[in-house]
Design a protein with these regions (language model features):
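Conserved nucleotide-binding/hydrolysis micro-motifs of P-loop NTPases
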Residues: 1-3, 43-44, 67-73
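Conserved substrate/cofactor phosphate-moiety recognition/catalytic segment
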Residues: 1-34
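Residue-level preference for the first positions of well-ordered beta-strands
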Residues: 35-37, 161
Length: 228
């Protein structure tokens, strides 16, 4: 559409016209019974809400999460003709809100890279979590903290999804750990801003993770942040 409207597929100055045209065509095709694939980053619920609300009520909406480990995303970006850079990828991952059925989604599918081995990925994440919090709010290392959360959930008979979320809810902390406060100043204690978003993204790589478990990981800080 970008090339059609301007003659240049890389023209970033006509985004408004591009999306207006795209949404108009999607709406028309759906009304005529034609299936559509809407390929966009859509990292937050708000990002996704516009196109979902645009769909007629009779439409079945599938969300396909085209997933890859963060480092693979960065490597792939370096090989693209038009790159965005690691900083942009970091910001996007730290905004991620896992897709869930209450958004109007009928089915959620996760597309992993060819040759991806979940067991090896889980082992790597498990090893990476064995770091100190260096923060007064936690006395255990990240790994031990998650193990304790899982043990509590299991002993109290919580659901499989809650147990899954408990063991992996802080898996993104090693990626986010920084001795910098929210104002960008050096800090003596570590901070883990937006680790819940990174943890939710990383959790797609684990075997048998349900959409509910991943959603729970993504919202587990809402109570403390006053978000919803």
């Amino acid at each position: 559409i970008r090339e059609e409207l301007s003659g240049d597929i890389n023209n970033q100055n006509i985004n408004k016209q591009v999306f207006e045209t795209l949404h108009k065509r999607v709406k028309e095709d759906l009304k005529n019974g034609i299936s559509c694939v809407y390929d966009a980053t859509n990292m937050t619920r708000k990002d996704r809400s516009y196109i979902i609300n645009l769909c007629p009520k009779f439409v079945k909406i599938e969300a396909h999460v085209v997933w890859a480990p963060v480092e693979l995303c960065v490597m792939r970006d370096t090989k693209r003709e038009r790159t965005v850079g690691r900083e942009v990828i970091d910001k996007m991952i730290k905004r991620y809100q896992p897709v869930y059925f209450d958004e109007g989604i009928s089915e959620i599918k996760v597309i992993r890279p060819n040759g991806f081995i979940p067991r090896m990925y889980a082992d790597h994440c498990w090893y990476a979590m064995n770091i100190p919090h260096d923060n007064p709010h936690h006395t255990y290392k990240v790994l031990r903290h998650c193990q304790e959360a899982y043990t509590y959930a299991y002993k109290h008979g919580f659901s499989k999804e809650v147990c899954q979320a408990a063991i992996w809810h802080d898996v993104g902390k090693p990626y986010c750990k920084a001795f910098i406060d929210k104002h960008g100043n050096p800090s003596e204690k570590a901070h883990f801003y937006q680790h819940q978003c990174v943890s939710a993204w990383m959790a797609y790589g684990f075997e048998d993770m349900s959409p509910l478990a991943i959603w729970l990981i993504g919202v587990h800080m809402d109570h403390y942040l006053g978000t919803k």
